[in-house]
Amino acid sequence: NDFYDPNFLVRGDEMYLIDWEYSGMSDYASDLGTFVCCSDYGYDEALRVYELYFGRSMAPEETRHCVAFTALASFYWFVWALYKEACGDPVGEWLYLWYRNTKAFGNKALELSASL
């Protein structure tokens, strides 16, 4: 649930996930959605990330699920950023990134839902 690049340490061919503050047993799309929403990936790049995770082409329902979860994760982090900003703790460019991803992936999730 906090699965994004600042929480990875990379040294050579080793990689460590740090910061377990928001860890939990949850839906696989939670980590994927957070990873994508905290990146500058567009929709097509996000689809590639999802497929790399699965190691195969995805079923339409799986795609919709991952895209919808990316929208939800983006919205969660956007609201968190608004709160932090209101408390005088600026989050910088993350605020706009999460806002933009909420809109983009939310609209795409609605399109995918209508087509299934």
Give the location of each predicted region.
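Active-site acidic catalytic loop and adjacent metal/ATP-binding pocket
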Residues: 1-30
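Intrinsically disordered, low-complexity N-terminal regions enriched in serine/proline/glycine
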Residues: 21, 52, 95-98
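Active-site activation/catalytic loop segments of kinase-like enzymes and analogous catalytic loops
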Residues: 29-58, 71-89
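Short conserved motifs of the RecA-like P-loop NTPase core
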Residues: 62
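ATP/Mg2+ or Mg2+-diphosphate-binding catalytic cores
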Residues: 79-116
